[in-house]
């Protein structure tokens, strides 16, 4: 009986994660108390940070909330930080939690409008370079005001929808009936080459769209969660943030868009594949049927969502309230005027954001450990000991390298908190503090496109239903992101070092 119970517990521990991963996490949990007793809290604190970064890097094996949460519960039990310190961190960063709770849910109710826009662009533009540029620009613009995860989710929804239609037609089934999209056994030989080409076409569009969310997300206060966190620490509103970051974000945005066009024209790194004409004909016929069947209520819903989007942009620009509260207003407006009154439909809007919100609380627990043990103080002191003109570039590199393997919200939280503490202690002027804040913000946003680990939108794309269908693997995503990483990361460093 005891063996079966032990086996069942081992099997259920961290669910479907690989055995080696479960063993590593268990080893961490056993090792930490021993390290604390023998080597002290500072060494153990650094080990804990590395362990937590490991859980973020292995996000495809297991969502980091569970293993990271276990490590931080242990840290609390070992008194490496206190519940009171964690609560203070949460209070201090409450605007970020509000953003994730309400803004992401609010944008969920705009999905029909966003899906409508992306679908029109996909079928209305024949030039692949222009189409890719439009996807990148629209993703960047939307991510500057909305949530990058939601924008990515909309692009994925459009891609899944179009892929499903053509896959069913290629398999000889009704495009409006459910079928197994993950199997090509029934795909007719005539359509196989077109299907493979369509997969490559969708891969490139999705990558352009995902990069677009990073290009736009760095620009504004609400573009990424870490932006709001940094803006909150600095006391910047929407317009303030945009203007402070613009010397870096605007040149990088322009360079990113030029890169998008060049990749398509030169057909490098897996880009440049065109949509097969037979696929276009099938999708256009399907879209025409949808337009003809659209009801008056659905048309009204699109108008309401469009008006709500305009109100959202105006409210953000004028900073009439905290960002999360504006998101709550969007929820109320759209649901009230489109007749969504069922609490189960409302609840689905919060499903995407709440796991990451919970993970963010774990981030703040790690930050509380770092504060209490003063882990990053020597590193920040070393950076601040450099000549002032070298400090922004060095912080940018430090943030960029760590953000590429870890989560950029976590990295930004650590660095902005430590730099602000140095400012409070009188180690720098307000002007220099603002320069370092911009370096931290851009350092966590731009080089992190290198891997899916750094950008939540990239990780979301990699773990979505569309990735296996279009053969988008981790390695292929890194390869396709490489030119963007070099251009955005390199120009970002140059701008931070010489233009701020």
From Swiss-Prot:
The keyword Transport applies. It is found in: Cell inner membrane. The chain crosses the membrane at residues 34-54, 58-78, 96-116, 129-149, 150-170, 205-225, 241-261, 311-331, 350-370, 394-414, 450-470, 477-497. Keywords: Antiport, Cell inner membrane, Cell membrane, Ion transport, Membrane, Sodium, Sodium transport, Transmembrane, Transmembrane helix, Transport. It is a multi-pass membrane protein. It comes from the Bacteria. It catalyses: 2 Na(+)(in) + 3 H(+)(out) = 2 Na(+)(out) + 3 H(+)(in). One of its GO terms (cellular component) is plasma membrane. GO terms for molecular function: sodium:proton antiporter activity. InterPro entries: Na+/H+_antiporter_NhaB. Pfam families: NhaB (PF06450). HAMAP family: NhaB. NCBIfam families: PRK09547.1 (NF007093). Na(+)/H(+) antiporter that extrudes sodium in exchange for external protons. Belongs to the NhaB Na(+)/H(+) (TC 2.A.34) antiporter family. This is Na(+)/H(+) antiporter NhaB. It comes from Pseudomonas entomophila (strain L48). The lineage of its organism: Bacteria, Pseudomonadati, Pseudomonadota, Gammaproteobacteria, Pseudomonadales.
């Amino acid at each position: 009986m005891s063996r079966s119970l032990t086996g069942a517990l081992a099997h259920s521990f961290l669910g479907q994660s690989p055995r080696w991963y479960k063993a590593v996490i268990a080893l961490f949990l056993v090792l930490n108390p021993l390290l604390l007793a023998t080597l002290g809290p500072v060494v153990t604190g650094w080990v804990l940070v590395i362990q937590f970064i490991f859980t973020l890097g292995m996000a495809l094996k297991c969502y980091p909330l569970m293993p990271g949460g276990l490590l931080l519960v242990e840290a609390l039990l070992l008194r490496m930080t206190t519940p009171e310190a964690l609560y203070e961190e949460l209070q201090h960063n409450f605007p970020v939690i509000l953003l994730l709770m309400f803004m992401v849910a609010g944008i969920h109710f705009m999905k029909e409008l966003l899906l409508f826009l992306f679908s029109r662009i996909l079928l209305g533009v024949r030039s692949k370079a222009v189409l890719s540029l439009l996807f990148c620009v629209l993703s960047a613009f939307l991510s500057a005001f909305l949530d990058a995860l939601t924008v990515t989710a909309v692009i994925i929804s459009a891609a899944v929808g179009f892929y499903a239609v053509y896959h069913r037609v290629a398999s000889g089934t009704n495009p409006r009936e459910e079928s197994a999209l993950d199997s090509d056994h029934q795909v007719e030989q005539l359509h196989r080459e077109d299907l493979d080409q369509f997969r490559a076409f969708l891969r490139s569009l999705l990558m352009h769209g995902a990069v677009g969310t990073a290009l736009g997300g760095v620009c504004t206060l609400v573009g990424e969660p870490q932006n709001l966190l940094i803006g909150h620490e600095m006391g910047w509103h929407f317009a303030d943030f945009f203007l402070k970051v613009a010397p870096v974000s605007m040149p990088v945005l322009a360079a990113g868009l030029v890169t998008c066009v060049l990749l398509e024209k030169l057909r490098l790194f897996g880009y440049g594949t065109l949509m097969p004409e037979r696929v276009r004909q099938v999708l256009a016929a399907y879209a025409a049927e949808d337009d003809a069947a659209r009801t008056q209520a659905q048309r009204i819903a699109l108008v309401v969502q469009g008006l709500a989007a305009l109100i959202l942009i105006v409210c953000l620009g004028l900073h009439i309230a905290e960002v999360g509260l504006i998101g709550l207003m969007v929820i109320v407006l759209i649901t009230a005027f489109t007749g969504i009154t069922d609490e189960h439909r409302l609840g689905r809007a919060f499903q995407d954001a709440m796991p990451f919100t919970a993970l963010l609380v774990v981030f703040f627990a790690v930050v509380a450990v770092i504060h209490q043990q003063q882990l990053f103080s020597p590193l920040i002191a070393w950076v601040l000991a450099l000549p002032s003109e070298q400090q922004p570039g060095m912080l940018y590199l430090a943030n960029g390298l760590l953000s590429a393997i870890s989560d950029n919200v976590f990295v930004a939280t650590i660095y902005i908190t430590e730099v602000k503490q140095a400012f409070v202690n009188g180690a720098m002027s307000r002007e220099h503090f603002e320069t370092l804040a911009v370096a931290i913000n851009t350092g966590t946003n731009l080089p992190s496109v290198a891997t899916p680990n750094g950008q939540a939108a990239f990780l979301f794309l990699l773990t979505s239903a569309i990735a296996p269908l279009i053969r988008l693997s981790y390695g292929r995503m890194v390869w396709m992101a490489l030119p963007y990483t070099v251009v955005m990361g390199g120009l970002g460093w140059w701008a931070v070092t010489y233009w701020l």
